[in-house]
UniProtKB/Swiss-Prot annotation:
Membrane topology qualifier: Peripheral membrane protein
Species in which this protein is naturally found: Arabidopsis thaliana
Transit peptide start and end: 1-27
Catalytically driven reaction(s): a 2-methoxy-6-(all-trans-polyprenyl)benzene-1,4-diol + S-adenosyl-L-methionine = a 5-methoxy-2-methyl-3-(all-trans-polyprenyl)benzene-1,4-diol + S-adenosyl-L-homocysteine + H(+)
Annotated protein name in UniProt: 2-methoxy-6-polyprenyl-1,4-benzoquinol methylase, mitochondrial
Pfam families: Ubie_methyltran
HAMAP family with a match to the protein in the record: MenG_UbiE_methyltr
Presence of keyword S-adenosyl-L-methionine: yes
Keyword tags: Membrane, Methyltransferase, Mitochondrion, Mitochondrion inner membrane, S-adenosyl-L-methionine, Transferase, Transit peptide, Ubiquinone biosynthesis
Single Gene Ontology BP annotation: methylation
Length: 288
């Protein structure tokens, strides 16, 4: 799980290559293994998450054997939440990451160690932004079940990662978990993340990634393509959506290339950490 850093120079070269290729196919993008028009992808992805919203959390448990919980704890640990922070969790509709950030901020032990006063605590705002209202509704219901329906620290916002409604330099932190591979233009989402963060703000992305160990990769591919779609059909009654989710991972840039894209968005101190041999990776960076 060693951290790896990336240079801006490599990022520029890779981004230029990607831009050249993109210019040849400027009106096409990937939806899983399919090539679709850019204007169609958002609707297709929206349909996927509308279909899976009600079973999204339980499927995460089943598909990962519960490991996604540990991965998200790792993500939040790297964020180091603090009282009074303004944080944006993008593609976070069901609230899984936001609730962990909330719990970290409001932890009695953490507050005692940091000598936090109540006034600072009340200034905390965690914005949960998702383009899909069905996913947000699941999150709001979960908040109600936790007794947080009217909590002022949690704000639910329907919005697009590529065109955020938040002010420049307004956020202390930005997280996106298992979401950025579903946007049509990753570069735009990264640019928006950079725009809304304050100087010194932290960017953190948890995403399914590329396994680097050959033998493990073969087993992982077998599990992904033969087991996960069947689980989707059995548990969620939706094979096609989970087939897309599996395929979308393979179309997502490898760890080094994605790190370079983050650097080219303007971020500094770009690093990534592979978990479970690269099944997932956490990319982190700072806006200086």
């Amino acid at each position: 799980m060693a951290l790896r850093s990336v240079s801006r120079r490599l990022g520029s070269r890779i981004l230029n290559q990607r831009s050249f290729v993109a210019s040849l196919h400027s009106h096409a993008t990937s939806f899983g293994f399919q090539e679709v028009k850019e204007e169609e992808k958002s609707k297709l992805v929206g349909n996927v998450f509308t279909n899976v919203a009600s079973s999204y959390d339980i499927m995460n448990d089943v598909m990962s054997g519960g490991l996604h919980r540990l991965w998200k704890e790792r993500l939040v640990g790297k964020l180091s939440p603090f009282a009074g922070m303004k944080h944006l969790d993008v593609a976070g509709g069901t609230g899984d990451v936001a609730f962990r950030i909330y719990d970290a901020v409001y932890s009695v032990k953490r507050r005692a160690l940091q000598k936090v006063d109540e006034a600072s605590l009340e200034e905390t705002q965690i914005y949960v932004c998702d383009i899909n209202p069905n996913m947000l509704n699941v999150g709001k219901q979960r908040a109600a079940e936790r007794g947080l329906r009217d909590n002022k620290s949690l704000v639910w916002v329907e919005g697009d990662a590529e065109a955020l409604s938040f002010d420049d330099n307004s956020m202390d932190g930005y997280t996106i978990a298992f979401g950025i591979r579903n946007v049509t233009h990753i570069e735009k989402a990264l640019a928006e993340a950079y725009r809304v963060l304050k100087r010194g703000g932290r960017f953190l992305c948890l995403e399914l990634s590329h396994v680097e160990i050959p033998v493990f990769k073969n087993l992982y591919d077998l599990y992904s393509f033969q087991v996960i779609p069947n689980l989707g059909e059995l548990i969620a009654g939706d094979r096609e959506s989970y087939q897309y989710l599996v395929e979308s991972v393979r179309r997502f840039p490898p760890q080094e290339r994605f790190a370079s894209m983050i650097a080219d968005a303007g971020f500094e101190k770009v690093e990534y950490e592979n978990l479970v041999g690269g099944v997932v990776a956490i990319h982190s960076a700072i806006k200086l």
